[in-house]
Amino acid sequence: MIDLYNYSNLEGLLDGLTDLNRIPKEYSAVLEPYFQNIARNAHLKSRALKICRSNFHKWNEEGAKTVNPEIIRRCLNLWYVLKGKEYKKLKDPPPADNIIKDEIDVSYVKNLNEVRLEFDEFGKLISNPLENLILEEVEVNDFIQE
C-alpha cells in the first residue's frame, strides 16, 4: 500500500502549494489531511509557515496583483491547521468560496442502519436515518456582516 503522507510527498506538496498549475484549485478542498500530516513534522511545519508568511506579506503589500486569492485561501487553511488559530494580520482577505454540493438522492439507499445505527431522543432505533434529510442552498453572504 502506498503511503500518501510520506515525507517526500508532503515536501512535494509544499513545493507546489503556491502553483495552481501543479495543484489546481479543484484540489484545494482535499488538502487538509496533507496539512495535518505536515503539522506532525517540525521541519515541514516550519517550511510551511515560512511559505504562508511570505504569501501573506505579498498579499498585504500588493494584494491580488501578485498572489492568487486561492493561494491565500490555501495558506489560511494551512496556517489554521498548523497553528490552531486564524491568521489575523491579513489585510482584506479574499472571500471564502461557497461550498456547493450537487443534488443528492438518498431515497434509493437501503439498509443504512447496517453501517451506522442511529437512535432518537427516546432511545428508539431510527429505521431510515436519512428519510427526513433536507438540504437547502444557502448563500453564506446573507449571514455575514461586513
UniProtKB/Swiss-Prot annotation:
It holds the Pfam family Swm2. The keyword Nucleus applies. Its main location: nucleus. It is found in: Nucleus, Nucleolus. It comes from the Eukaryota. Disulfide bonds: none annotated. GO terms for cellular component: nucleolus. The lineage of its organism: Eukaryota, Fungi, Dikarya, Ascomycota, Saccharomycotina. It comes from Saccharomyces cerevisiae (strain YJM789). Belongs to the SWM2 family. This is Nucleolar protein SWM2. Keywords: Nucleus.
